[in-house]
Amino acid sequence: NVRADASYQAEGGARDMPYNQINSVPLEGNAENSDRLRSTLSATRLGLDFKAPIADQNLNAKIEVDFLGGANLDNLRIRHAYLNYGNWLIGQTWSNFATPDYIPETIDALAYVGASIKRTPQVRYTHKFTPNTNLVAAVEDPKDASMSQRMPAFTGRLNHKFNDALSISGRAMAHEKRIQNQEEWAYGVGVGAKFDITPVTSVKADYYHVKGDSSFVSFTNPGVVATGTSIEQSEFDSITVGLTQKFNDKLRGTLAYGYMTFDKNQDYLDAVADDTKINKNLWQAWGNLFYSPVQPVSLGVEYVYGEREAFAPAANGSKKGEDNRVNLVAIYNF
């Protein structure tokens, strides 16, 4: 597709991009960034799908790129690149743990608090118990830039579809974290659900509990910090829930809310240089409308408001930062 994004930021982050920065927005009265217009076409996607018959099955492959790579989110990058044969998948695609299936719809390409849009290199195997129940196991490279690693992350996901209206997913993750000669195991669990209340009204919800990792779920504090004698871990819970209403064939809208809260670990906070950058709570609420005047075109408008609360106050005593934006998008799908 070809995609153009724009954002008017009444209050928000310092980076020059029209996407979510809730975990790093300036605290009130401290170099706030307000009254900004930002735009980009970097979320434009190009992709190819391949299929080749082998024995009694097809070997499927996918390559997809966009331009949200690099420090400034303006370089070409790989989104998906994988082979799929039978029950096996090898390559890069959505993480088996941090799946986007249960995120309420949003215009923001980086999503909001409580969500994850993680893609990882992985080897994945899917086992079907019944037509409505399957177990997916994978080894993944989460590419955690904050530390060195010698082992992949181990992830598992159990999916079940009760009927055409209700589906759920339970997930688990474990990953060794190493800083120099110190090591700890990170872990996480997640559960998501989608329920179609009526043919035109649906609810999505997703929950995570994670300790010691910041590479899968978005907008977290650093998963681990080194004290010199040990590794201290961050621990958090997050939830996102949203209602989507289809008004007619051309118009739909979503109202949603995301929240993330971090446990207080004093040893962790003592090991961090600046506790104003370590968050105690994050939340965001958003509402959007998508209009499709003709089949390949979608136009969207969205309002989002959110806050972050830091563990430590800034020099002026403030612990709160705000994210207050209007997002616009135009998409041509081909």
Label each region the model flagged.
Residues 1-18, 24-142, 148-155, 159-163, ...:
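Outer membrane beta-barrel
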Residues 10-15, 72-78, 100-107, 142-152, ...:
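Outer-membrane beta-barrel translocator domains and adjoining extracellular loop/strand segments
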Residues 35-44, 75-79, 117-121, 150-154, ...:
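Residues that define the transmembrane beta-barrel architecture of outer-membrane proteins
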Residues 49-63, 169-175, 186-198, 288-290, ...:
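Transmembrane beta-barrel strand/turn architecture of Gram-negative outer membrane proteins
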Residues 58-69, 135-143, 167-178, 252-261, ...:
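Transmembrane beta-strand segments that form the barrel wall of outer-membrane beta-barrel proteins
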Residues 61-63, 88-92, 137, 158, ...:
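Membrane-embedded beta-strand positions of outer-membrane beta-barrel proteins
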Residues 156, 160-283:
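Detector for outer-membrane/organellar transmembrane beta-barrel domains
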Residues 291-293, 320-334:
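Outer-membrane beta-barrel "beta-signal"
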